[in-house]
Amino acid sequence: MAPKLQAQFDAVKVLNDTQSKFEMVQILDENGNVVNEDLVPDLTDEQLVELMERMVWTRILDQRSISLNRQGRLGFYAPTAGQEASQLASQYALEKEDYILPGYRDVPQIIWHGLPLTEAFLFSRGHFKGNQFPEGVNALSPQIIIGAQYIQAAGVAFALKKRGKNAVAITYTGDGGSSQGDFYEGINFAAAYKAPAIFVIQNNNYAISTPRSKQTAAETLAQKAIAVGIPGIQVDGMDALAVYQATKEARDRAVAGEGPTLIETMTYRYGPHTMAGDDPTRYRTSDEDAEWEKKDPLVRFRKFLENKGLWNEDKENEVIERAKADIKAAIKEADNTEKQTVTSLMEIMYEDMPQNLAEQYEIYKEKESK
């Protein structure tokens, strides 16, 4: 005998029908060919080249950062190779007045949003100056607590709306972050108040070593938007054009007062979760890695630009050499930054130092002068 409710309301059918509507949006296939002309963004040739330059530069930064970490010259570092399209194409769709609330893997976005590379290196080293962003860089320090940036983004977006700013707040997390309570609280608050926010889930298939299949029964992560009443979209995160267009349209909606959007980018990290001892060979197969390497966002976008006559090996080598020079100069500047002291940390905590800390400050100041 069929359940009584099912005769009038088949909840399973509703679920299946809903999930089937979340098809991954793609503009460029793995060979760099346009598969959906109608969705190609209105970017000039110069902008397309600039986006490619940023992706190449960032891949070199990732390689050098891993090397510097192994040398003991950088502290905490989360590799980014494989996620350049998800990170940089979304940032490229922003305006200077927009705010970025990054996770710990999202340093490239805030670098291209104005953060000096030296500051990024100091952040990795745990130096307080790595958290003191220059005036005009609309970004918060990378969030270490997984998912907490979603609450912060909702708050920043709400403030932008209250102040009548024509700007948005964008934040990022991985698939693992979408399992956190902060994720739901953030998107629900932003949805309820139509705050101008863009929530990006970079679905790289693993929360450290936990596969996505062990995190949720949902067929997509984009469909989680339905529960709070906002649009959700799943895009090919290895396709720079698809990521850009999805982010641009989400931004247009947000500044028009239509509220937030949830974007799931299907991507992959080629390296370990972080350089703090993670070994991806323990939970990923070489066959899986090989399949995703065929989808490399740089290779795909390179082929697209080469077909348009906008990119060649000489141009790429120029960017690589420039990246190496930039990194060398920035790490040298970081090396020459004065060491932090107890008093230097206390000086930046309060505008008016409490009496009990002021007394301790004088004690440490005397010790440090010896």
From Swiss-Prot:
EC top class, as a word: oxidoreductase
Keywords in alphabetical order: Oxidoreductase, Pyruvate, Thiamine pyrophosphate
Reaction(s) this enzyme catalyzes, per UniProt: N(6)-[(R)-lipoyl]-L-lysyl-[protein] + pyruvate + H(+) = N(6)-[(R)-S(8)-acetyldihydrolipoyl]-L-lysyl-[protein] + CO2
Domain of life, source organism: Bacteria
GO biological process terms on file: branched-chain amino acid catabolic process
UniProt-listed InterPro entries: Alpha-ketoacid_DH_E1_comp, DH_E1, PdhA/BkdA, THDP-binding
EC number: 1.2.4.1
PANTHER family membership: 2-OXOISOVALERATE DEHYDROGENASE SUBUNIT ALPHA, MITOCHONDRIAL
Record's subunit section: Heterodimer of an alpha and a beta chain.
Name of the protein in its database record: Pyruvate dehydrogenase E1 component subunit alpha
Organism: Staphylococcus aureus (strain Mu50 / ATCC 700699)
